């Protein structure tokens, strides 16, 4: 019964992927819109994202929700730009609720894509090296990996979601850890995003980049030292 369910899930997801690719290449309007969305995230300017979302008027919140799910699937597009935009557009706590719920939906989609379609698809949507790094975290911290990674801003939330789907972890354990883990970052980004204007925007963005790079260097050094330690123990 379980195998039949997984097979059905694979068929449904494959049909959805094929349909999405076909629409992208065959419908000019969709192609143009998707290219615009990619360029918007690539700009690194949350005001561009905010203006795009705001242009949909009464449907702005719905568009933001869908964009968050899209950026989750198309890792590693920067989610913090959308979180900043939501806070700046809707108010910091309203934006936080929207960003948190939509990020949870996106994480769930990534989890099930990996769980149903497997590692090859997950690697194509993220990166082989990125998943390998998260695998290292899972080997070391087990189920606590989700909570730890969600609290580290320099680790892609989306890659963690895909990696979790490749493990034996239950969806509910993943969902709860994800919800708790990404709440602090969502609140902080939303609060800051609600105040960002002009020079403050550039200043905070620079601080975030500096912090992320510093933390990344520290973590890579830690992983390198652990591997060297294992090699030395293996020689003894």
Predicted region positions:
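Membrane-interfacial helix-loop-helix
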Residues: 2-10, 20-64, 93, 104-159, ...
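Hydrophobic core positions of alpha-helical segments in small-molecule transporters
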Residues: 63, 98, 176-177, 189, ...
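Transmembrane helix boundary and interhelical junction motifs in multipass membrane proteins
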Residues: 65-94, 154-160, 172, 179-188
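Transmembrane alpha-helical core residues of multi-pass small-molecule transporters
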Residues: 67, 102, 106, 180-181, ...
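Transmembrane alpha-helix boundary and packing residues in multipass membrane permease domains
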Residues: 83-84, 111, 120, 162, ...
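Transmembrane helix-bundle signature of multi-pass membrane transporters/permeases
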Residues: 100-104, 151, 175-183
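Hydrophobic alpha-helical transmembrane segments that constitute the membrane-spanning cores
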Residues: 102, 114-115, 184, 189
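Extracellular/periplasmic helix-loop-helix junctions in multi-pass membrane proteins
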Residues: 186-204
């Amino acid at each position: 019964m379980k195998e039949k369910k997984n097979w059905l899930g694979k068929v449904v997801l494959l049909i959805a992927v094929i349909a999405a690719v076909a629409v992208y290449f065959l419908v000019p309007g969709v192609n143009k819109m998707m290219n615009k969305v990619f360029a918007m995230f690539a700009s690194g300017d949350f005001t561009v994202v905010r203006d795009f979302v705001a242009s949909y008027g009464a449907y702005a919140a719905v568009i933001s929700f869908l964009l968050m799910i899209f950026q989750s699937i198309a890792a590693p597009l920067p989610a913090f730009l959308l979180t900043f935009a939501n806070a700046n557009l809707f108010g910091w706590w309203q934006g936080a609720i929207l960003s948190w719920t939509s990020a949870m939906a996106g994480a769930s989609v990534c989890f099930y894509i990996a769980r149903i379609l497997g590692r090859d698809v997950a690697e194509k949507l993220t990166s082989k090296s990125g998943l390998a790094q998260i695998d290292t975290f899972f080997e070391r911290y087990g189920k606590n990996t989700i909570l730890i990674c969600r609290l580290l801003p320099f680790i892609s939330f989306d890659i963690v979601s895909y990696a979790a789907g490749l493990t034996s972890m239950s969806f509910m354990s993943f969902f709860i850890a994800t919800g708790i883990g990404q709440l602090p970052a969502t609140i902080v980004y939303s609060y800051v995003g609600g105040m960002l204007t002009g020079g403050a925007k550039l200043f905070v963005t620079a601080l975030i980049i500096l912090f992320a790079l510093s933390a990344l260097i520290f973590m890579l050094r830690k992983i390198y030292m652990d591997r060297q330690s294992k090699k030395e123990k293996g020689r003894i």
